[in-house]
Amino acid sequence: MKIQAAFLLISLVLLPALSSHADTVQTTANGIKYPIGLKNWRVISSSFRTDNNTQRVILGNSLAINASRSGKTNPWPNGAILAKLVWKNSQHPQWNKAIVPGEFVHSEIMIRDSSKYTSTGGWGFARWIGETQQPYGEKKSFAQECFACHKHAKDSHFVFTKPATIP
């Protein structure tokens, strides 16, 4: 009985610490929730944008990782989730030739569901702004903004990311 009571007490103390960041982030206007466990996802690729001086790391859930490693990304499988974490570029303070992540800008999520997201090429789009992860877009239709750019990547299944080769 003492062991059960001790276990219960320890569980009650640790449970709040185990809560996910995703539990505290608001759902977007189109109903997409911040993915649980995203901080533990694996890298698919990275990219830089010269037009807005930002860098990105693209992560994937297990379905996306398996598809990217096996070359099965056109089309991406239903259930694949891509997460893009975006930072402003910053010069490394001790090495001026190096660019490192600076201020965090936003997170973007693409969820592959060919039946649910028919108006956006089979992808659900979501974005959360800043370190406080405030949902972007007040109306459900904000995803059309995302798709307006992504439709130019039709030949690669509406995804700009090219999976990086990992030897």
For each feature predicted by the language model, list its residue ranges.
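Bacterial N-terminal signal peptides
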Residues: 7-16
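Sequence context surrounding c-type heme c attachment/ligation sites in exported
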Residues: 23-54, 73-167
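Positively charged n-region of N-terminal signal peptides that target proteins for export
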Residues: 1-6
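Short, structured beta-strand/loop micro-motifs enriched in basic residues and often containing a Trp
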Residues: 54-67
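Sec/Tat signal peptide C-region and signal peptidase I cleavage site
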Residues: 18-22
